[in-house]
């Protein structure tokens, strides 16, 4: 099924962000022009590899009772920063200022075609906090954002109070299972992925426990950018992020994180990037994420893991109330 309308209906946006206004009826560009975010979006100018870039972010003020703390939310590979809205709302209500960036290559940020680095992403994030005058933060990272959260905490430990990792990938070194895959092969595979195939991929790979309509905006974004004249740039940028995940493991440094750390894992989440490229006999060994999180937490100075049984990869959307209660309980410990 090919979806090429170039528009997002109000019902689809509301499925993700109930309080968001209807988006303008514009085509979706590769920086998600025409796709509404639930809060005002600003941009940090950056120069990398000779390219002038813009890093998009939402800087959401606290509610009525500010607690003087700031939360930094780091998105996953397949999701725009706007999917954090249920968590933003819960944090604001308890007094947090919330900073929610789209990393370079994602969401409303620029889409360069050069290779990505977790170290560069961490530096960009630190530069954003500097611009906003933010010192210490509580960091929450989901999926690929969990890998970045680990690298950010290791690179800037003085800037992190607490670290929450929601269904992070990178809890194993995928190079031990998956051979290198050429970028051009990945581009061709992604180009040929239909909306129906991507929808099935999300549901199966992420073991999502939500009504299908709640993941439809993710499918629509991915499909609608195909109508952009800059789609080849988006495609190469997206594929480059797989190579980052594959080639820059963080599992070996997770036990070295000294900040209080909470893994929040879906018990059914067996997501493992690159699994289809692994030898058949190795695939079942990959993606035992809940167990991997428990084992890693036990090796950390101040780590622990909470497993949400019957939940998949999108924990903060599949189990919204429980996730928010667990996260806030962790962030407020001893405060």
Locations of regions flagged by a protein language model:
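Catalytic active-site module of serine/aspartate enzymes centered on a nucleophile-bearing elbow/loop
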Residues: 290-335
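Flexible "cap/lid" loop of the alpha/beta hydrolase fold
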Residues: 154, 163-193
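Conserved HGGG/HGGXW glycine-rich cap/lid loop of the alpha/beta-hydrolase fold
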Residues: 49, 53, 58-108, 326
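Conserved serine/cysteine hydrolase catalytic core
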Residues: 44, 227-298
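Gly/Ala-rich beta-loop-alpha elbow adjacent to hydrolase catalytic centers
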Residues: 141, 145, 149
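N-terminal cap/lid segment of alpha/beta-hydrolase-fold proteins
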Residues: 30-60
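Conserved acidic catalytic loop of the alpha/beta-hydrolase fold
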Residues: 119-137
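Glycine-rich "HGGG/HGxG" loop immediately N-terminal to the catalytic nucleophile
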Residues: 42, 82, 101-118, 174
């Amino acid at each position: 099924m090919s979806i090429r309308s170039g528009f997002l209906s109000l019902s689809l946006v509301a499925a993700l962000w109930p309080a968001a206004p209807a988006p303008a009826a514009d085509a979706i560009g590769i920086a998600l022009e025409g796709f509404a975010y639930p809060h005002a979006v600003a941009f940090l100018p950056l120069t990398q590899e000779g390219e002038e870039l813009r890093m998009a972010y939402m800087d959401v003020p606290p509610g009525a009772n500010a607690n003087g703390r700031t939360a930094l939310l780091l998105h996953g590979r397949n999701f725009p920063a706007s999917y954090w809205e249920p968590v933003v709302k819960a944090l604001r209500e308890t007094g947090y200022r919330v900073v929610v960036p789209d990393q370079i290559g994602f969401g409303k940020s620029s889409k360069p075609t050069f290779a990505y680095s977790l170290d560069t992403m961490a530096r960009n994030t630190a530069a954003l906090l500097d611009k906003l005058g933010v010192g210490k933060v509580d960091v929450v990272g989901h999926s690929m954002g969990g890998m970045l959260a680990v690298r950010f905490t290791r690179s800037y430990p003085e800037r992190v109070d607490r670290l929450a990792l929601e269904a992070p990938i990178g809890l194993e070194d995928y190079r031990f299972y998956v051979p290198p895959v050429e970028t051009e092969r990945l581009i061709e595979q992604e180009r040929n992925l239909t909306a129906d195939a991507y929808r099935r991929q999300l549901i199966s790979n992420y073991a999502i426990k939500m009504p299908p309509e709640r993941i439809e905006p993710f499918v629509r974004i991915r499909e609608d950018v195909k109508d952009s004249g800059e789609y080849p740039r988006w495609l190469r940028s997206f594929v480059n992020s797989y190579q980052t995940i594959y080639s820059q493991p963080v599992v070996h440094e997770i036990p070295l994180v000294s900040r209080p750390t909470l893994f929040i894992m879906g018990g059914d989440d067996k997501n493992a990037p690159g699994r289809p490229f692994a030898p058949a006999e190795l695939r079942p060994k990959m993606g035992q994420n809940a167990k991997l999180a428990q084992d890693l937490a036990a090796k950390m100075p101040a780590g622990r893991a909470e497993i949400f049984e019957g939940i998949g990869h999108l924990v903060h959307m599949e189990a919204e109330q429980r996730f928010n209660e667990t996260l806030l309980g962790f962030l407020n410990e001893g405060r």
